[in-house]
């Protein structure tokens, strides 16, 4: 066919030619359909707009004409004068009526509350309707109140009231402990003022080191002199700081001359220095021995906690801290007092032991089981169990060996024996059958005499004092690798003197993992202890646990004295503390002495600043105890919290190394202790030990890596020393809002949940008084109380301070010690703030406060009115809703509460309870769930939630974006997978109703839909619920297009912010934030995993272009779908405090396999490729695709960071085949998510990776895992022991039922309570068990029952010891307490009064009791010492003893009758098979 004919035919309209192909048909069809629709819509729109404008114009013209006519009429009536205008009468009536009703508001409220006056109320309603009164029905909003100024600012007042010289003096000598005012004034008499000009030396090398220098004005520089003659600046001492060495202080007091060997000090400018000679302390110490001992103890604690902590944990120095004296071969290692025959016999015995065939390995007991003070009745089981963990290193149990090898008891309760240190089986024989005849041929008396004389000289005692020390010295023979004490053991602390052989001192690696620390093979060798040397003095003086593990390197003989014996010797000879301290100081290396001049121990009160912004950074700080807050001040003056630091954190290290000025101000949140490491000391150590540089590089790398993962894209804008706010607290104060709050059961429940994470301690005022004495809260005992509390905090991962219901000294102490304050209230009661709560806020202005609202488990409704609670308490930073079991709200006496929870603590806690969620939050182990956006694919979230629930993973926090915001909000609101599934299915069905969506269509200027019907579906799902009222903490993320950033919503209207997070661009308009008017879009545009609940859910679903942006009702900002910024906000969840995060991503994936089309691109070529079926297709994004990819740029980058993070478990179900709007496939998509999630978590469980989600664990377990009571490891005040001050009340089983008291075994995990098989049960007085009666007599009854058992124990005969287990104490040792006739009069009178009351009570109630009633099972308690009294009563001891004996006889007769009744009843119970264990005593068993 001719081409011209074809073209002519085409022009004439004949399309049956070459151009009549597929593409022309497609184009014509599309044009026709779209033209019709758009034409119709445009026509309808034009008509509507014209009609609207016409009527609006017509109405305005009518209004203008009417106004003109009215004005003209009034003008004519008043003669043309406008001043004659008056209000109409009806307007006046409306005005005065409304005014009257405002005045009568209170009266009307009373009428409504009284229920009377129906006619009056009817009149009021009629008047309100006539007067057109309208109530504002605005939702309750969260008051955005800035924290008080004290929260972010330091305290500056208070220092001007003290003269500068006295203030600096007080601050400088505080390192020696607490001094009373008379002692301080005596020290001030010896001070001297030194005037120094610039360049003058304060001291030089070879000058005596015998003074404390305090800079009053000016500046002093301390230098260190190297061997080559060069000098290096060690630190700069400014006004108020001091130059001293505590190690030289001990040298001076010990009588040793001390000189400056490598340190000099020079004045940099004109300075005034206060000089305090160290000899001034000697005068004070002679008059007050207790002050001397306390100062030595403080110095040793500073040495261990400051010097060793800084140099070992942060600089990686271990062996460099101690001198390792090497012995010359052939020298005589044994003291010259040992005769020659003894040496030869000892060497023969050693060779015999070395050549003896190896026996079975000696197992050692674990640090949890082994104690010297409380022997285990079955040591072999625990030893075998520990041997599997700690390898083959044998361990010697000195106590058990002592019990098996010796039958004589010395004066101190210790056994004098020199038998071989080999394990014994039954019958006292060794496993190889050779017995204990290894050194029987050695003269025991000479060896013992040599040991006594050696230890006497080491302790600085004279020959006349031999009789004092001789009863306590013990000698042992050790085989190689025998362990004397393990690191962290506090019970087996002794003073060891090496007679022959060598001991090796080890320490665990600070960087080792948890498993590596438990393996003794990974311990680092510190130094050797050779013959003639002593070890163990540091732990003896500090009273803390041993910092080292000591093992025998070879066959050795040691002489040792136990801790209790040392303290008895110390009472008679207090100055032995100087010799013990001097022995510790002699062992230290010169590096430690140089560091002692530079390192400072700083005490900061709450509100004081460590350093300020823009100051020079010349030092770094180590937080020893307390809490610090870092605050940055912006150029406009606004302050913002950058981070918080807790115990063990390093503050200011980055700024010091980079030599930049301080970027933030760091202040103390509560009373804190810090170690100051100057830059000069850091440089000196760095030059001498290059390994320090490697250590710091590793430390800083981990810090920056964590900061990058935490802050993500905002890392560049954060300060250099930024540390995100951590939610891991070490001390928690519990404050009841009102008296009816069950604070004691609440503390028990929280303690029960915390025990599953690690060792926890619960402290009350009663516990502290019984442990430290009734006068412990006085000012004179400040040091003892502070040191004891600090030691308890070091032992436990968290300490609970239960406050009193009044502003007592104990409550004030709790506020000073707390890292966070939990304000506990009843959620269903009034939200009003009481006077006590306001006083609490004044006491701890800088401490973070969190509100805990309790609800009974029987409640069916979700929490409500939370906003009222929060608005009334602007100081609260976070709130928790806790659902409580029934036993918490049951009214019981303190005795019954303690008895109830003694059984509860034996069970495992419910890890899914709200108490467990709160426990994980406090310890920094919260588990977060992040749900990403993806439209209809979000139905997979429901299946994943079910799989998570079946895997046993608790959910502590939930965050979501877009559809994930909707599903997450449903879970936080219901917490029931069935209800959540039902509501999600109903919402998905509504989204499939196309006729509702057609009615929601609008002119597409901002979006295709108006969003009205979409809002209604979300509002119907949630109702008017606020985010604050959800059971689980929840947040959603939206895109704020007004401020061009993402916004995190943790409070406000739920449905609105969910709607905002689902506002996808182009489909719905952005949501306008009512707070600030900002426009919010879907949060997935910036981050796709993260008032009234529905509003923010709606805001999070505002898809741009589909739904309009949602306007925030708070500020007016426009909110869109959060997927534009962050579609999986796991980083936001991590910043909010979640430690372990599960992130579920259901978003669509972009195609990255695109065609490379070269340097230029022709649209015609793409059109040809697309419409030509005979060519290969190309993958080039079109314009809408490019716009979409640009919108999701930040989201994709954020998602990659989440995938590579170590805190997040990223999960993506296989739902790519489902479209974004396929809401009709809800059940199918849900099943896909469930099957995938179930298989995924099953594989994680098999691989061992599920434990961090569904099993509680302790990242840093304590050195000892079994703390049965506070007595096992407690603060030891040497001054109290030496000076025989009033002794403390030991916590034992006797005190467990006193008010607000703990149980024996209550301090550790609940499983340790299984060891306490015997508890006392005492019947109540009276016959009624009504809770309305006063039950304060329970504690008195327990005391009476205890005295009855005491009287019985004193009259009984001790049974024969158990031969099979020689270590088991006899009954004479296990009595409750002894009442010797030489007892002090006051104690006897107290017991006598109790016995008289018990005797009278029994005589009165004997004829009333029914003998057929079942009696309670009774048990004995563990042995416990009775506290001594310090005063004498005027009563005669003889009369008291006679009367006491008489009452004992009467009591014994009563007991014989009671025992016979009890035996008969037990026989009857055995016949019926109803005998129960003491642990299973129920509440009904307490009936009398």
Curated annotation (Swiss-Prot):
Q: What is its EC number?
A: 3.1.1.5
* Catalytic site positions: 962, 1082
Q: Which residues carry this modification: Phosphoserine?
A: 1176
- Domain of life the protein comes from: Eukaryota
Is Thylakoid a UniProt keyword of this protein?
no
InterPro entries for this protein: Acyl_Trfase/lysoPLipase (IPR016035), cNMP-bd_dom (IPR000595), cNMP-bd_dom_sf (IPR018490), LysoPLipase_patatin_CS (IPR001423), NTE (IPR050301), NTE1_P-loop_dom (IPR056556), PNPLA_dom (IPR002641), RmlC-like_jellyroll (IPR014710)
- Is Endoplasmic reticulum a UniProt keyword of this protein? yes
Compositional bias of type Basic and acidic residues: which residue ranges? 1440-1452
User: What stretch of residues is annotated with the motif GXSXG?
Assistant: 960-964
Q: How does it assemble?
A: Interacts with Pka-C3; interaction inhibits the catalytic function of Pka-C3 and the esterase activity of sws.
What protein does this entry describe?
Answer: Neuropathy target esterase sws
Q: Which species?
A: Drosophila mojavensis (Fruit fly)
């Amino acid at each position: 066919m001719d081409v011209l004919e074809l073209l002519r035919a085409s022009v004439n309209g004949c399309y049956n030619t070459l151009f009549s192909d597929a593409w022309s048909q497609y184009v014509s069809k599309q044009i026709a359909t779209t033209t019709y629709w758009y034409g119709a819509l445009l026509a309808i729109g034009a008509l509507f707009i014209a009609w609207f404008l016409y009527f609006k114009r017509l109405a305005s013209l009518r209004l203008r004409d009417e106004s003109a006519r009215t004005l003209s009429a009034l003008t004519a009536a008043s003669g043309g004068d406008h001043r004659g205008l008056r209000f109409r009468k009806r307007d006046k009536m409306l005005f005065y009526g409304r005014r009257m009703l405002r005045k009568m508001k209170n009266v009307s409220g009373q009428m409504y509350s009284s229920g009377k006056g129906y006619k009056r109320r009817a009149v009021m309603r009629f008047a309100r309707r006539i007067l057109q009164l309208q109530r504002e029905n605005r939702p309750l909003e969260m008051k955005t109140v800035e924290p008080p100024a004290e929260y972010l600012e330091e305290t500056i007042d208070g220092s001007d009231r003290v003269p500068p010289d006295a203030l600096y003096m007080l601050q400088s000598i505080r390192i020696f402990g607490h001094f009373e005012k008379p002692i301080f004034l005596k020290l001030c008499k010896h001070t001297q003022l030194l005037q120094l000009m610039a360049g003058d030396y304060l001291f030089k090398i070879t000058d005596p080191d015998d003074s404390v220098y305090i800079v009053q004005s000016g500046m002093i520089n301390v230098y260190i002199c190297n061997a080559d003659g060069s000098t290096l600046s060690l630190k700069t001492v400014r006004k108020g700081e001091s130059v001293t060495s505590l190690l030289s202080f001990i040298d001076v007091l010990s009588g040793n001359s001390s000189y400056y060997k490598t340190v000099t000090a020079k004045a940099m400018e004109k300075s005034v220095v206060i000089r305090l000679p160290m000899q001034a302390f000697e005068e004070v110490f002679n008059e007050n021995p207790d002050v001397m001992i306390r100062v030595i103890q403080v110095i040793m604690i500073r040495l261990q906690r400051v010097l060793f902590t800084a140099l070992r944990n942060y600089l990686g120095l271990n062996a460099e801290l101690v001198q390792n004296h090497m012995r010359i071969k052939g020298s005589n290692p044994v003291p010259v007092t040992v005769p020659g025959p003894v040496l030869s016999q000892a060497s023969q015995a050693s060779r015999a032991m070395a050549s003896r065939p190896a026996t079975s390995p000696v197992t050692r007991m674990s640090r949890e089981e082994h104690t010297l003070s409380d022997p285990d009745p079955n040591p072999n089981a625990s030893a075998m169990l520990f041997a599997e963990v700690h390898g083959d290193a044998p361990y010697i149990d000195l106590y058990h060996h002592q019990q098996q090898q010796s039958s004589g008891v010395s004066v101190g309760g210790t056994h004098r024996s020199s038998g071989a240190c080999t394990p014994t089986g039954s019958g006292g024989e060794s496993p190889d059958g050779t017995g204990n005849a290894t050194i029987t041929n050695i003269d025991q008396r000479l060896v013992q005499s040599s040991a006594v004389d050696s230890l006497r000289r080491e302790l600085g005692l004279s020959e006349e004092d031999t009789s004092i020390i001789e009863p306590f010295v013990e000698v042992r023979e050790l085989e190689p690798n025998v362990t004397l004490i393990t690191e962290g053991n506090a019970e087996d602390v002794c003073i060891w003197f090496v007679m022959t052989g060598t001991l090796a001192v080890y320490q665990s690696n600070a960087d080792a993992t948890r498993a590596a620390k438990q393996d003794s093979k990974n311990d680092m060798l510190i130094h050797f202890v050779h013959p003639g040397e002593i070890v163990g003095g540091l732990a003896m003086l500090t009273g803390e646990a041993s910092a080292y593990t000591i093992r025998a390197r070879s066959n050795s003989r040691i002489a040792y004295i136990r801790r209790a014996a040392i303290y008895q010797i110390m009472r008679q000879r207090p100055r032995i503390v100087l010799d013990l301290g001097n022995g510790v100081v002699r062992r230290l290396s010169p590096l430690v002495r140089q560091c002692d001049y530079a390192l400072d121990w700083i005490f900061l009160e709450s509100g004081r600043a460590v350093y300020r912004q823009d100051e020079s950074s010349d030092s770094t700080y180590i937080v020893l105890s307390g809490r610090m807050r870092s605050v940055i001040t912006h150029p406009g003056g606004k302050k913002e919290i950058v981070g918080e630091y807790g115990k063990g954190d390093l503050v200011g290290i980055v700024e010091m190394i980079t030599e930049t000025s301080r970027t933030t101000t760091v202040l103390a949140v509560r009373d804190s202790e810090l170690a100051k490491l100057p830059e000069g000391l850091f440089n000196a150590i760095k030059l001498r030990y290059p390994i320090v540089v490697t250590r710091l590089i590793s430390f800083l790398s981990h810090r920056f890596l964590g900061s990058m993962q935490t802050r993500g894209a905002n890392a560049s804008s954060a300060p250099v020393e930024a540390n995100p706010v951590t939610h891991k607290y070490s001390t928690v104060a519990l404050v009841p809002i009102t008296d009816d709050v069950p604070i004691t059961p609440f503390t028990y429940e929280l303690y029960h949940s915390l025990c599953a994470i690690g060792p926890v301690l619960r402290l009350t005022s009663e516990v502290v008084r019984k442990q430290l004495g009734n006068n412990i809260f006085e000012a004179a005992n400040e040091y003892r109380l502070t040191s004891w509390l600090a030691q308890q905090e070091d032992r436990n991962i968290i300490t609970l301070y239960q406050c009193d219901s009044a502003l007592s000294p104990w409550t004030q102490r709790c506020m000073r010690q707390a890292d966070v304050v939990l304000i506990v209230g009843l959620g269903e009661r009034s939200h009003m703030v009481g006077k006590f709560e306001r006083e609490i806020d004044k006491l701890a202005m800088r401490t973070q406060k969190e509100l805990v609202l309790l609800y009974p488990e029987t409640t069916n409704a979700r929490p409500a009115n939370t906003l009222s609670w929060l608005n009334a308490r602007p100081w609260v930073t976070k709130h928790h809703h806790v659902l409580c079991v029934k036993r918490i709200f049951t009214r019981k006496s303190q005795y019954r509460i303690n008895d109830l929870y003694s059984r509860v603590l034996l069970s495992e806690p419910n890890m899914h309870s709200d108490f467990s969620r709160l426990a994980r939050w406090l310890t920094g182990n919260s588990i977060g769930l992040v749900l990403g956006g993806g439209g209809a694919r979000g139905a997979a979230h429901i299946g994943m939630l079910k799989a998570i629930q079946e895997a046993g993973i608790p959910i502590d926090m939930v965050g979501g974006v877009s559809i994930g915001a909707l599903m997450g909000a449903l879970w936080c609101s219901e917490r029931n997978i069935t209800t959540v599934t039902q509501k999600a299915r109903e919402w998905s069905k509504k989204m499939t109703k196309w006729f509702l969506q057609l009615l929601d269509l609008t002119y597409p200027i901002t979006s295709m839909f108006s969003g009205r019907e979409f809002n209604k579906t979300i509002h119907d799902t949630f109702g008017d619920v606020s985010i604050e009222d959800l059971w689980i903490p929840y947040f959603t993320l939206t895109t704020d297009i007004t401020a061009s950033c993402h916004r995190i919503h943790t409070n406000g209207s739920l449905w609105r912010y969910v709607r905002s997070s689902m506002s996808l661009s182009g489909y719905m308009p952005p949501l306008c934030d009512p707070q600030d008017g900002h426009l919010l879009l879907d949060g997935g545009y910036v981050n796709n995993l993260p008032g009234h609940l529905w509003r923010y859910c709606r805001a999070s679903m505002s898809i741009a272009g589909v739904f309009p942006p949602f306007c925030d009702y708070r500020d007016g900002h426009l909110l869109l779908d959060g997927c534009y910024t962050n579609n999986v906000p796991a980083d936001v969840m991590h910043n909010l405090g979640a430690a372990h995060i599960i992130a579920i991503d259901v978003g669509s994936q972009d195609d990255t396999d695109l065609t490379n089309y070269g340097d230029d691109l022709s649209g015609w070529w793409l059109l040809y490729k697309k419409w030509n079926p005979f060519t290969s297709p190309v993958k080039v994004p079109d314009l809408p695709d490019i716009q979409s990819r640009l919108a999701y740029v930040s989201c994709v980058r954020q998602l990659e960071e989440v995938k590579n993070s170590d805190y997040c478990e990223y999960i993506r179900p296989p739902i790519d085949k489902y479209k974004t709007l396929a809401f009709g496939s809800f059940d199918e998509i849900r099943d896909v998510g469930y099957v995938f999630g179930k298989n995924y978590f099953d594989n994680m469980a098999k691989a061992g990776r599920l434990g961090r989600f569904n099993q509680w664990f302790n990242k840093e377990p304590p050195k000892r895992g079994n703390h049965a009571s506070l007595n096992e490891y407690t603060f030891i005040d040497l001054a109290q022991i030496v000076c025989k001050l009033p002794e403390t009340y030991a916590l034992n089983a006797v005190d467990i039922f006193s008010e607000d008291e703990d149980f024996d075994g209550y301090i550790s995990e609940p499983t340790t309570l299984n060891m306490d098989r015997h508890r006392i049960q005492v019947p109540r007085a009276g016959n009624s068990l009504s809770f309305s009666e006063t039950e304060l007599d329970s504690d008195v009854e327990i005391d009476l029952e205890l005295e009855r058992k005491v009287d019985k124990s004193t009259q009984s005969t001790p049974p024969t010891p158990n031969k099979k287990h020689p270590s088991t104490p006899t009954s004479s040792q296990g009595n409750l307490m002894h009442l010797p006739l030489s007892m002090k009069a006051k104690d006897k009178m107290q017991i006598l009064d109790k016995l008289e009351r018990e005797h009278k009570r029994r005589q009165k109630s004997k004829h009333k009791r029914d003998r057929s009633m079942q009696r309670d099972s009774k048990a004995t308690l563990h042995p416990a010492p009775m506290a001594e009294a310090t005063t004498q009563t005027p009563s005669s001891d003889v009369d008291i003893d006679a009367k006491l004996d008489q009452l004992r006889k009467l009591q014994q007769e009563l007991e014989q009758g009671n025992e016979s009744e009890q035996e008969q009843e037990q026989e009857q119970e055995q016949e019926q098979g109803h005998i129960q264990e003491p642990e299973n005593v129920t509440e009904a068993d307490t009936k009398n």
